[in-house]
């Protein structure tokens, strides 16, 4: 919150490769491309692997400081390699386990409030009205994002999409 990095004269390019992320067993192979240019903090063209099932690509992302709060805004593209293991890990009901290859969405994460909102969600290059309504309702909710709320979100997401 000090805005130390928000300096018009500061330019940094960092590429960070992390094989294993400690205390988060499921995430590995993190590649983080951090660019600070004239005070803008960008984290684009980065990715992380969830087990060997998903590749989560972070695109067009920007960290900004606005009215005393820090936000990460961007686009995520999730490439799904193994749906079965993913569904098992999140204990998705078997009747809601169908093949999907890709999920794309925009997001805005408020670090100060630990809240996230989603927009423009596309599954296998198609929009779904039921999912749009689900996302809009989720965004109106004031719950803090944590492991439990995330798991519940994922379960409800697939229940609505394939239900």
Language-model features, listed with the residues they occupy:
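Membrane-proximal interfacial segments on either side of biological membranes
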Residues: 1-163
């Amino acid at each position: 919150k000090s805005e130390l990095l928000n300096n018009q004269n500061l330019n940094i390019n960092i590429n960070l490769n992390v094989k294993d992320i400690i205390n988060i067993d499921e995430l590995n192979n993190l590649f983080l491309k951090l660019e600070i240019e004239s005070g803008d903090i960008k984290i684009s063209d980065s990715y992380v692997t969830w087990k060997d099932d998903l590749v989560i690509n972070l695109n067009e992302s920007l960290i900004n400081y606005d009215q005393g709060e820090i936000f990460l805004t961007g686009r995520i593209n999730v490439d799904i390699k193994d749906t079965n293991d993913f569904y098992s890990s999140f204990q998705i009901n078997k009747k809601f386990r169908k093949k999907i290859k890709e999920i794309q969405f925009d997001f805005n994460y408020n670090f100060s409030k630990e809240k996230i909102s989603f927009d423009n969600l596309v599954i296998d290059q198609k929009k779904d009205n039921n999912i749009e309504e689900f996302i809009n309702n989720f965004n109106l909710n004031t719950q803090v994002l944590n492991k439990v709320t995330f798991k519940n979100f994922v379960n409800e997401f697939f229940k609505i999409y394939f239900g």
